[in-house]
């Protein structure tokens, strides 16, 4: 059985991580591209989790 509350918490965690990497990119221009790539991946993970939650609710 899928633990929806755990997935929701993971979704929020991925979004927080993405924001953290984006903030780091602003502070470290030399790593900007890499950090934005990581943030993008975190947002993709969050989107996948969101789809799992939505699919489970239907």
Named regions from a protein language model:
Residues 1-58:
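Non-heme di-metal
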